[in-house]
Amino acid sequence: MDYDYEKLGLKVGLEIHQQLNTKRKLFCNCPTKIRDDEPHGEIERVLRPSQSEMGHVDKAALLESKKEKKFIYQYYNDTTCLVELDDEPPHDVAPEAVDTALEVSTLMNMKMADEVQIMRKMVIDGSNTSGFQRTMFVSQEGFIETEYGNIGVTSLCLEEDACKKIEDGKDYTKYCVDRLGIPLLEITTEPDITSPKMGKEAARRIGTILRATGKVKRGLGTIRQDVNISIKNGARIEVKGVQNLDLIEKIIENEVTRQISLNEIKEELLKRNAEVVDEIKDITELLKDTESKVLKNALKNKGVIRAILLKGFSGMIGREVQPGRRLGTEFSDRGKVLGGVGGLFHTDELPKYGITEEEVIKLKEYMNCGENDAVILVADKKNKVERALNAVIERAKESMIGIPEETRKALDDGNTSYLRPLPGAARMYPETDVPTITITEEKLEFVRNNLPEMPEEKLVRFVKEYELNEDLAKQMVMSYHVDLFETLSKKYSKIKPTLIATTLEATIKEIKREGLDTDLLTEEHLEELFNGLSEDKMSKEAVPDVIKGFIENPTKKLDEILEIKGMSSMSVEEVESIIEDIINQNISQVNEKGMGAMGLLMGRCMAQLRGKADGKLINTTLQKKLKEKVQ
């Protein structure tokens, strides 16, 4: 939808969370390795909120504690330790992570802190075994340059990543501690972004700076973007967990749509003198004979059915606020998160879901529901229903006041759903187990003198030095394999850099699309591959099949792969002999067409020699031998 974002007063700020590719974790010597094999053990614990140094309890932390969940943590004996399990004090901060934080800060023109104080940020959703995340403020007041103008960078913090969520049950959440403690940069921008396109460009530019260091992890889940969005007469909404850069634009557009829609609903409710009735009524007896599967299952499990009346809300609950999501979805999200129920029904969508028209009439009569009113009902265990409907009552009241400030979860379709209230500042307090870090002028001078080459500079160099075309150079500059490309190109000067680049950027991706696990392909495999090419052990046409061979047989050497695939390189004499045989086998076509038989013969030569001899050698040899026959 086309909006005048300037008129709407759109303000957007970003929080970028990027994992660092360091040798060790931030507060222990464990490797920064994510695993998917069977864990060696589990522990269980329950977390509770405590007061900050100011004597306050954070409302988001308090909300999590009310869910009364148990947390289960998986661990590995060889790649995790007691620090992750909160049974051993943290070690000193990893120097490599601090150096990277200073490097990124310098690239974003930021002012460094003289002394870095480690803080504890209260988090009791179970994602940290200790109930808090260790974080440290490194720099502030910087900026990045984009095609839309400069965007301020508020702060850069170095912190530990949280546990990896494995499973979310009704009364428990299971995590793995392999991700806990991986160094993470948190970069926060000023709300200088004024359009969805500008938001995407800002995130892209920050990502470019991070990748330029060569010290960040790549792949799904290694970078997470949170987006703070507000408009005039709206509210600040924090959208968590946008993993896809291309989704940022749509997230911003859809949040603007949501806030405009919620404001329109508010105005309509005020015109109607709408009212939220606080009373929760038990309607279990009224609907005890229903044929609705959802309601029957709840009653079968000794649950109850209860309802609330919303005066003046008829037609409003079913009104769309985002593509495919309605005000009723907003109510349902609150009930699900705060009550733990599966969902709710409302009269804007009934009769439906097995609830008959006759039952709706009885329900409206029992609830004293007028023509402009609406009823919401929930079926589940009594305590869950009470919590859910109280949450819906609160959200319904908010819909007559405006837009509540919330933290929301990014969905894959560009919409968002409720997570929790916006956290406050009451959840931060100093870390007492780790000493502060002094940032010296000598350290900063070293960082400034060793800054990495920026991608735009590298692009120009790749076109000039390696003779890549601009499109391939752009791909290579942004590639995870960029350092490997330079290493291989310098080491194997006999091989054209274009072949190395297309192998790393195109061939491997094509093989992955065929369904092979390219994660099994190592740098050592690629080193062997290009070494074999440079020594004429194989032809360039054999590259895709050799890569597949390494994936299928990760422990085999190149010579073994070539033997398995039947692709050992032939001598010039062997190639000449085979081509001569092919010409003799097709002599009638040669006599009839002369040099015009070249295409037919080339196809037959390649069918027999592909991967065993260089295509250029095959072509020149065939031309030479064919001319001899024709003459």
From Swiss-Prot:
Read off the InterPro entries from this record: Asn/Gln-tRNA_amidoTrfase_suB/E, Asn/Gln-tRNA_Trfase_suB/E_cat, Asn/Gln_amidotransferase, Asn/Gln_tRNA_amidoTrase-B-like, GAD-like_sf, GAD_dom, GatB_C_1, GatB_Yqey_C_2
Q: Name one GO biological process term.
A: translation
Q: State whether keyword Protein biosynthesis applies.
A: yes
UniProt-listed Enzyme Commission number(s): 6.3.5.-
Q: Which UniProt keywords apply?
A: ATP-binding, Ligase, Nucleotide-binding, Protein biosynthesis
ATP-binding as a keyword? Answer: yes
The record's Gene Ontology cellular component field reads: cytoplasm
Reaction catalysed by this enzyme = L-glutamyl-tRNA(Gln) + L-glutamine + ATP + H2O = L-glutaminyl-tRNA(Gln) + L-glutamate + ADP + phosphate + H(+)
GO MF terms here are: aminoacyl-tRNA ligase activity; ATP binding; glutaminyl-tRNA synthase (glutamine-hydrolyzing) activity
- Taken from the UniProt record, the cysteine pairs bridged by disulfide bonds within this chain are none
Partners and quaternary state? Heterodimer of GatD and GatE.
**Family designation:** Belongs to the GatB/GatE family. GatE subfamily.
Record function comment:
Allows the formation of correctly charged Gln-tRNA(Gln) through the transamidation of misacylated Glu-tRNA(Gln) in organisms which lack glutaminyl-tRNA synthetase. The reaction takes place in the presence of glutamine and ATP through an activated gamma-phospho-Glu-tRNA(Gln). The GatDE system is specific for glutamate and does not act on aspartate.
Protein name according to UniProt: Glutamyl-tRNA(Gln) amidotransferase subunit E
Organism classification, top ranks?
Answer: Archaea, Methanobacteriati, Methanobacteriota, Methanomada group, Methanococci
The gene coding this protein: gatE
